[in-house]
């Protein structure tokens, strides 16, 4: 699933394309269940003739602001991705929704596994109001993080994956942040001392910023993996220290990386650097 760096990269790609200001002349819906709200009929009516004013991000959600003050909120889930092309570009059978613009450009939403969801609403808080703070904003201070962690008995990895606690972190960047901080994923959050809490705070920011600079993580070939708007790969997969590195030597101590299951997720750790 695309995490904060991947979604950030997609949003930047969309902003830098010719998309902003484009007027939607028609919409084609090939998989109606992609639309969470409203119905396909109402959706097509409400976006018809509207232009895309801005594209932004909140956590793992992409937010398109339309000229009628409506907001299209998209969650990519496992395999959702966008392609901004001309009408002459051959379409794959995995396009679920397509916007057609007045000059022949098209915005296509590909989703192999059909888990992605679109929401068209007038109030973004209806969909994203439950989300926790953004870890890369200046308002996400260590003092705030320390206060958030107090009295939390939840296992560390499970807590960091909780989007109502903090947004944008998923399996990749949690594993990488915990390795950077030398923390075991099964430690209860309230048992981390102040020194290691500060290290974790900076590690979260570091791995996310590194992921953004590398334009995200593409874990393999094929349509089920993350790709940028132009179809190119991210580069962060070449910089991973532990994620999907089972059996490889730890870059820090040389011990072999191990895999365990935490919160029903494959989790990768160095058992020497990250002792429980």
Curated annotation (Swiss-Prot):
Q: What is this protein called?
A: Formamidopyrimidine-DNA glycosylase
Q: Does the keyword RNA-binding apply?
A: no
Which reaction is the catalytic activity of this chain?
Hydrolysis of DNA containing ring-opened 7-methylguanine residues, releasing 2,6-diamino-4-hydroxy-5-(N-methyl)formamidopyrimidine; 2'-deoxyribonucleotide-(2'-deoxyribose 5'-phosphate)-2'-deoxyribonucleotide-DNA = a 3'-end 2'-deoxyribonucleotide-(2,3-dehydro-2,3-deoxyribose 5'-phosphate)-DNA + a 5'-end 5'-phospho-2'-deoxyribonucleoside-DNA + H(+)
Q: Which UniProt keywords apply?
A: DNA damage, DNA repair, DNA-binding, Glycosidase, Hydrolase, Lyase, Metal-binding, Multifunctional enzyme, Zinc, Zinc-finger
Protein task: Involved in base excision repair of DNA damaged by oxidation or by mutagenic agents. Acts as a DNA glycosylase that recognizes and removes damaged bases. Has a preference for oxidized purines, such as 7,8-dihydro-8-oxoguanine (8-oxoG). Has AP (apurinic/apyrimidinic) lyase activity and introduces nicks in the DNA strand. Cleaves the DNA backbone by beta-delta elimination to generate a single-strand break at the site of the removed base with both 3'- and 5'-phosphates.
Q: Please name the InterPro entries in this protein's record.
A: DNA_glyclase/AP_lyase_DNA-bd, DNA_glyclase_Znf_dom_DNA_BS, Formamido-pyr_DNA_Glyclase, FPG_cat, MutM-like_N-ter, Ribosomal_uS13-like_H2TH, Znf_DNA_glyclase/AP_lyase, Znf_FPG/IleRS
Cofactor: binding comment: Binds 1 zinc ion per subunit.
What's the family? Belongs to the FPG family.
User: How does this polypeptide assemble, per the annotation?
Assistant: Monomer.
**SMART domains in alphabetical order:** Fapy_DNA_glyco, H2TH
Q: What is the lineage of its organism?
A: Bacteria, Pseudomonadati, Chlamydiota, Chlamydiia, Parachlamydiales
């Amino acid at each position: 699933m695309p995490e904060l760096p991947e979604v950030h990269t997609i949003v930047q790609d969309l902003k830098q394309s010719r998309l902003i200001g484009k007027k939607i002349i028609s919409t084609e819906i090939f998989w109606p269940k992609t639309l969470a709200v409203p119905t396909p009929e109402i959706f097509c009516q409400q976006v018809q003739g509207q232009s895309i004013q801005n594209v932004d991000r909140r956590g793992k959600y992409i937010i398109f602001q339309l000229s009628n003050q409506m907001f299209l909120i998209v969650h990519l889930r496992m395999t959702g991705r966008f392609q901004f092309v001309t009408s002459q570009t051959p379409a794959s059978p995995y396009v679920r929704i397509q916007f057609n613009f007045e000059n022949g450009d098209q915005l296509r939403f590909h989703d192999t596994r059909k888990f992605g969801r679109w929401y068209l609403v007038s109030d973004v808080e209806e969909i994203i109001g439950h989300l926790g703070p953004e870890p890369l904003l200046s308002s996400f201070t260590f003092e705030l993080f320390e206060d958030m962690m107090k009295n939390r008995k939840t296992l560390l990895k499970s807590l960091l994956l909780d989007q109502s606690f903090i947004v944008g972190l998923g399996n990749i960047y949690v594993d990488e942040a915990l390795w950077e901080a030398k923390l075991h994923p099964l430690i209860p959050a309230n048992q981390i001392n102040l020194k290691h809490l500060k290290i974790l705070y900076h590690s979260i920011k570091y791995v996310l910023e590194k992921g953004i600079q590398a334009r995200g993580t593409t874990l393999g070939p094929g349509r089920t993996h993350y790709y940028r708007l132009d179809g190119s790969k991210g580069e962060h997969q070449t910089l991973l220290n532990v994620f999907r590195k089972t059996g490889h030597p730890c870059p820090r101590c040389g011990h072999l990386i191990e895999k365990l299951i935490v919160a029903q997720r494959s989790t990768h750790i160095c058992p020497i650097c990250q002792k429980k």
